[in-house]
Amino acid sequence: MNTVGTPLLWGGFAVVVTIMLAIDLLLQGRRGAHAMTMKQAAAWSLVWVTLSLLFNAAFWWYLVQTEGRAVADPQALAFLTGYLIEKSLAVDNVFVWLMLFSYFSVPAALQRRVLVYGVLGAIVLRTIMIFTGSWLISQFDWILYIFGAFLLFTGVKMALAHEDESGIGDKPLVRWLRGHLRMTDTIDNEHFFVRKNGLLYATPLMLVLILVELSDVIFAVDSIPAIFAVTTDPFIVLTSNLFAILGLRAMYFLLAGVAERFSMLKYGLAVILVFIGIKMLIVDFYHIPIAVSLGVVFGILVMTFIINAWVNYRHDKQRVE
């Protein structure tokens, strides 16, 4: 697997992520079982975005010193594009978490605890998936066409899909988990497991954590191939992906109260997936530059938010009338 990642870059990335996670977990422990406020969520979202941009700037500077601008510019642009793609697709993941917490009636104070472990699990699972994907691409380059076709199909499916939280409990996976886990009927404070009559029982909070992890894996199956359309370098794919999901918990609490105001977002994300799928399928006939890909993705997101704002304005105006 060809990569610009050197031991220094890998080590620096690991140190930054470890320190930030330790600070985040330390603050989580001090606050106890309290919901993250909108102000805290906004502050942490800003921290993670700023840290990601600073890392990319340091990454660019390092490559300029060691490889020159000819290498540094496209690699830093690839990181930024991958980060933007993952960050935008992660919003849909956040809305699924909101549905899960709503269906299982998880209090806001406990949602934070679930998401702490959910994000930690996502880091491990996505790291495994990215290195596996990089190895597969290095051995079988035709697999990019499979990724492209899959993203094209997923984009169309996303645009046509209708989410309904009322049917979550009837999903085969949920029924299977409930049937194979010794589980209590109610949430017991912040515990994932409790003992009753000498037996260990999982609480509904554990079921929610499992579903949060599985939902992230499902979304990673979309987002990781999308970043491989930009670059196959495992260092850039992994760092851009993980920096994007590290801020997911803060993003959740930032958007949780206004989820219904983003009704048009899934269509914008669907267009992004279709574009990336087509980009991967035509790569042998026409190579779309990274700068163009970044511009297209950013442009789609801007147009989506403009349309969304217009739709919300129309709805609010109709309510007043």
Curated annotation (Swiss-Prot):
The keyword Disulfide bond is assigned to this record: no
Signal peptide: none
Its membrane topology: Multi-pass membrane protein
InterPro entries in UniProt: Integral_membrane_TerC (IPR005496), Integral_membrane_TerC_rswitch (IPR022369)
Disulfide bonds listed in the record: none
Transmembrane segments: 7-27, 44-64, 90-110, 114-134, 136-156, 199-219, 226-246, 262-282, 287-307
Any GO CC annotation of this UniProt entry: plasma membrane
Annotated compartments: Cell inner membrane
Taxonomic superkingdom: Bacteria
Topological domain spans for side Cytoplasmic: 28-43, 111-113, 157-198, 247-261, 308-321
Keywords: Cell inner membrane, Cell membrane, Membrane, Transmembrane, Transmembrane helix
Pfam short name (any one): TerC
Segments in the Periplasmic topological domain: 1-6, 65-89, 135, 220-225, 283-286
Homology family: Belongs to the TerC family.
Function: Has been proposed to be a redox modulator.
Entries under NCBIfam families matching the protein: R_switched_Alx
Protein name as it appears in the record: Putative membrane-bound redox modulator Alx
Species: Escherichia coli O6:H1 (strain CFT073 / ATCC 700928 / UPEC)
Name of the encoding gene: alx
